[in-house]
UniProtKB/Swiss-Prot annotation:
UniProt pathway annotation: Amino-acid biosynthesis; L-lysine biosynthesis via DAP pathway; (S)-tetrahydrodipicolinate from L-aspartate: step 3/4
Pfam family name, one: DHDPS
Matching NCBIfam families: dapA
Positions annotated to bind pyruvate: 51, 209
Keywords, alphabetical: Amino-acid biosynthesis, Cytoplasm, Diaminopimelate biosynthesis, Lyase, Lysine biosynthesis, Schiff base
UniProt xrefs under PROSITE patterns: DHDPS_1 (PS00665), DHDPS_2 (PS00666)
Name recorded for this polypeptide: 4-hydroxy-tetrahydrodipicolinate synthase
Family according to the record: Belongs to the DapA family.
BP GO annotations: diaminopimelate biosynthetic process; lysine biosynthetic process via diaminopimelate
Gene Ontology MF terms in the entry: 4-hydroxy-tetrahydrodipicolinate synthase activity
Quaternary structure, from the entry: Homotetramer; dimer of dimers.
Domain of life: Bacteria
Taxonomic lineage from the root: Bacteria, Pseudomonadati, Pseudomonadota, Gammaproteobacteria, Pasteurellales
Site (Part of a proton relay during catalysis): 50, 113
Length: 298
């Protein structure tokens, strides 16, 4: 891995987990989604992250969905496994179960609800990294976890060999520069915010772990490819068309709007989510539909 050839880069899909009306994972639909993203030029898939409803899948279900995603990919696209938890022991269990699954790496979120200190975050991720040889991507999303992992803590963790990068989802693009300065140019920084993804790449991020690319996969792949090549005019043209969609896919809690949008576009058979998440409110649906039209998807 080097700054010129990072392990993970470009348009990375925060993949939805398709379900039927009974809340069971729809594996035939999942296989079609994997094919769709390969054909569209996506650079990697995150299986069972936040957008994949990791919080309401059991450990056994998490592992099965990830393993099936790897199986469907057939080595044609890297699969990153969502393997985080707010209990270090549970995150270690998940990570160990994925050791021989064929995943390219693991995405591990800052522990949520229990609000660890910076030292607690460091020890949490250090313990996970020490249990595996799999590349680890940190995930900082304070709006969901209630805790913000500071760039200085990220830099400490970057010294651990198999902690290779971070999904940075504060929305503060200045963090990209700060982390690069402290952690070094070979440490991968991936934007976790579609609205600021292009700006993040301009400031040195290697790509975007995106919700939007669930439904605009080719556009997002093209945007990231142009941006990483320095062709910002073409990247800006695509991003401007998608900006309303970037916003409206978070008009209710993620992944509620993106599942409805994927259903509306025929990419999945049902917009069903597991409780406590419910399908997109009827009064909100026209707004998301308008965003799809503005993006040129309808």
């Amino acid at each position: 891995m080097s700054a010129q050839n990072p392990l993970f880069s470009g348009s990375i899909v925060a993949l939805v987990t398709p379900m039927n009306h009974y809340g069971e994972v729809d594996f035939s639909c999942l296989e079609k989604l994997v094919e769709h993203h390969i054909e569209a030029g996506s650079n990697a898939l995150v299986s069972v992250g936040t957008t994949g409803e990791s919080a309401t899948l059991s450990i056994e279900e998490n592992v099965k969905v990830i393993e099936k995603t790897v199986e469907f990919a057939k080595g044609r696209i890297p699969i990153i496994a969502g393997a985080g938890a707010n209990a270090t022991s549970e995150a270690i269990t998940m990570t160990k179960l994925l050791r021989d699954s064929g995943v390219a790496g693991c995405l591990s979120v800052v522990p949520y609800y229990n609000k660890p200190t910076q030292e607690g975050m460091y020890q949490h991720f250090k313990a996970i990294a020490e249990c595996t040889d799999l590349p680890q991507i940190l995930y900082n999303v304070p709006s969901r976890t209630g805790s913000d992992m500071k760039p200085e803590t990220v830099a400490r963790l970057a010294e651990i060999e198999n902690i290779v990068g971070i999904k940075e989802a504060t929305g503060d693009v200045s963090r990209i520069v700060k982390i690069k300065q402290l952690a070094g140019k070979n440490f991968i920084v991936l934007s976790g915010n579609d609205t600021t993804g292009l700006e993040a790449i301009k400031l040195g991020a290697e790509g975007v772990i995106s919700v939007t690319n669930n439904i605009a996969a080719k556009d997002m792949a093209d945007m990231c490819r142009y941006a990483l090549a320095g062709d910002f005019d073409k990247a800006e043209e695509i991003n401007a068309r998608l900006m309303r969609l970037h916003h409206d896919l978070f008009i209710e809690s993620n992944p509620i709007p993106v599942k409805w949008a994927a259903y509306r576009l025929g990419l999945i058979k049902s917009p069903h989510l597991r409780l406590p998440l419910t399908t997109l409110s009827e009064e909100i649906q026209p707004k998301v539909e308008d965003a799809l039209k503005i993006a040129g998807l309808l």
